[in-house]
């Protein structure tokens, strides 16, 4: 099952899959990519964990979203940040996965293990 995303790719990044408090951590803090995809501070989104295909998809969902885009301040500007730190990441990516390929689409972000 492939998550539904708009076909137009807005950008991509190769990032390190981190660890925080003994759990896998995904930290997305590229303002240009997040804003282009529509992920703004305070906006709600839902995460779709797909262990069978090694993929996590994030979808903007103002009504049913269970997660919120965080922010960090730089001067007077609020920059979007997505911080995912939970056990479900380990169910999607095996222990030998140390990097992730993050692809940005309008209203969606797809994260794959590398």
Short names for language-model regions:
Residues 1-11, 24:
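N-terminal intrinsically disordered, low-complexity, charge/repeat-rich segments that act as generic
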Residues 58-65, 112-114:
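Secondary-structure transition/turn motif
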């Amino acid at each position: 099952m492939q998550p539904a995303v708009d076909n137009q790719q807005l950008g991509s990044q190769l990032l390190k899959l981190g660890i925080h408090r003994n759990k896998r951590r995904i930290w997305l803090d590229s303002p240009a990519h997040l804003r282009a995809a529509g992920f703004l501070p305070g906006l709600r989104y839902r995460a779709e964990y797909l262990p069978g295909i090694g993929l996590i998809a994030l979808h903007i969902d103002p009504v049913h979203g269970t997660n919120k885009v965080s922010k960090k301040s730089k001067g007077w500007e609020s920059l979007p940040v997505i911080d995912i730190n939970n056990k479900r990441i380990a169910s999607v990516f095996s222990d030998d996965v140390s990097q992730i390929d993050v692809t940005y689409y309008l209203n969606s972000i797809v994260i794959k293990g590398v």
